[in-house]
UniProtKB/Swiss-Prot annotation:
Keyword Glycoprotein: no
Known pathway: Cofactor biosynthesis; thiamine diphosphate biosynthesis
Entry-linked CDD domains: ThiG
A Pfam family of this chain: ThiG
Stated name of the protein: Thiazole synthase
């Protein structure tokens, strides 16, 4: 079972709460996904008013753990300030830390990310950093005190799936004691299964479910994909080969097939 800081869960699927056709569909999709952790944006909910209260009521009804994020922040100062506001609003020291460097790719500002993570951890936060698949960046985040690291599969909302499989595998091999979550870029349940097959502890996604023709059915499909991927990893996947290997044994071949 995946462990996030001092809390253990059963689901390996974390899910976002944005972009759904309606609040009711959001609730149904989250239930169908089996997710126990949902991400929420402070910027969305801090807008205040009745809409924010109604959204928070829907989330409470789901009986899930809330992971606030700093989505949209483009500087260390902005991310740190947003994280502190989120702690006050949601009553949790958990924060999904995002510091964005580029508006087109939404690529993380890895230098600012490490700096912000260091500041927040010293202030008592438990940080879930959204980063690239770069090993040196992940290592710096771990050295700063992060016990969870969340590398992307591909740019947010791209639905491309895992672009750099070798780099993600290297992260898993080099950080065996860190909870690793593939975050962003997953577009199909098979992408989630692939991440879990690599030994990742969980995946986080939003758009692939929220923008599906049937978000509830897609959420269920991702749940099954995660289950399949983790089961395959635990069962032990065979190594890929460059050449064919017969699956039918030669022993017991009928005599008329024997070569003279």
């Amino acid at each position: 079972m995946p462990t996030f800081y001092d809390k253990t869960f059963t689901s390996r699927l974390l899910i976002g709460t944005a972009l759904y056709p309606s609040p009711a569909i959001m609730q149904d999709a989250i239930r169908a996904s089996g997710a126990e952790i949902v991400t929420v944006s402070l910027r969305r909910e801090a807008a205040g008013g009745k809409s924010g209260d109604a959204f928070w009521k829907l989330i409470r009804e789901l009986n899930v753990t809330v992971l606030p994020n700093t989505a949209g922040c483009r500087s260390v100062r902005e991310a740190v300030t947003t994280a502190k506001l989120a702690r006050e609003l949601f009553g949790t020291s958990w924060i999904k830390l995002e510091v964005i460097a580029d508006n087109d790719t939404l690529q993380p500002d890895v230098v600012g990310l490490v700096e912000a993570a260091t500041i927040l951890i010293k202030d008592g936060f438990e940080v879930f950093p959204y980063c690239t698949e770069d090993l040196s960046v992940a290592t710096r985040l771990v050295d700063a005190g992060c016990k969870v690291v969340m590398p992307w599969a591909a740019p947010i909302g791209s639905a491309k799936g895992i672009i750099n499989r070798d780099a993600l595998k290297l992260l898993r091999d080099r950080l065996p004691d860190i909870t690793l979550v593939v975050d962003a870029g997953l577009g199909a349940p098979s992408h989630a299964a692939e991440a879990l097959e690599l030994g990742y502890d969980a995946v986080l996604l939003n758009t692939a479910v929220a923008k599906a023709a049937d978000p509830v059915a897609m959420a269920r499909a991702f749940r099954l994909g995660c289950d399949a991927g983790r089961t395959a990893y635990e069962a032990g996947l065979m190594d890929a080969r460059d050449f064919a290997s017969p699956s039918t044994p030669v022993v017991g071949t009928p005599f008329w097939h024997a070569v003279s």
